Amino acid sequence: MAGISQHGKAFIRPKAKAHLLIVEARFHDDLADALLDGATSALEEAGATYDVVTVPGSLEIPAVITFALDGAAEGGTNYDGFVALGTIIRGDTYHFDIVANESSRALMDMSVQDSVCIGNGILTTENDAQAWTRAKRSEGDKGGFAARAALTMIALKEQLGARS
């Protein structure tokens, strides 16, 4: 299988042209733009196609992925995988922990229990500076990393013959 690399680690491309759904949270618009830029660039570089759905915040991302899976079961678009993009920056309340933990848990549950290929690009940071370091394509490129992770999971699912 052809590989793509980032930071010296191989990413595997799916055999067939993959079609993904990017679900992006717009709570921090500028950071969302940077994450989306990285994700779409990585998918285009890999020859994948994608749709984008925007949600208010990261906590809504898992629900939209579930809506898409339910829609596919009813004859709607069948996505090979998903890219979750958002930024959660710690504030003065417990809300950060709830959003970070619950969005991550829900994505992991779908991935493990339902064999859903998800690249998790939801940043959880202490401040804006950390978020920008991770979001910018010229630095951390976590949007691109999440897209390549989703593609790798699609390829591994194909390779291992996992259920759809």
Curated annotation (Swiss-Prot):
It catalyses: (2S)-2-hydroxy-3-oxobutyl phosphate + 5-amino-6-(D-ribitylamino)uracil = 6,7-dimethyl-8-(1-D-ribityl)lumazine + phosphate + 2 H2O + H(+). GO terms for molecular function: 6,7-dimethyl-8-ribityllumazine synthase activity. Keywords: Riboflavin biosynthesis, Transferase. (2S)-2-hydroxy-3-oxobutyl phosphate binds at D92, T93, R134. One of its GO terms (biological process) is riboflavin biosynthetic process. Pathway: Cofactor biosynthesis; riboflavin biosynthesis; riboflavin from 2-hydroxy-3-oxobutyl phosphate and 5-amino-6-(D-ribitylamino)uracil: step 1/2. Its EC number is 2.5.1.78. The keyword Transferase applies. GO terms for cellular component: cytosol; riboflavin synthase complex. 5-amino-6-(D-ribitylamino)uracil binds at F27, S58, L59, E60, T87, I88, I89, N120. The active site is at H95. It is an enzyme of class 2 (transferase). Catalyzes the formation of 6,7-dimethyl-8-ribityllumazine by condensation of 5-amino-6-(D-ribitylamino)uracil with 3,4-dihydroxy-2-butanone 4-phosphate. This is the penultimate step in the biosynthesis of riboflavin. Belongs to the DMRL synthase family. Homopentamer. This is 6,7-dimethyl-8-ribityllumazine synthase 1.
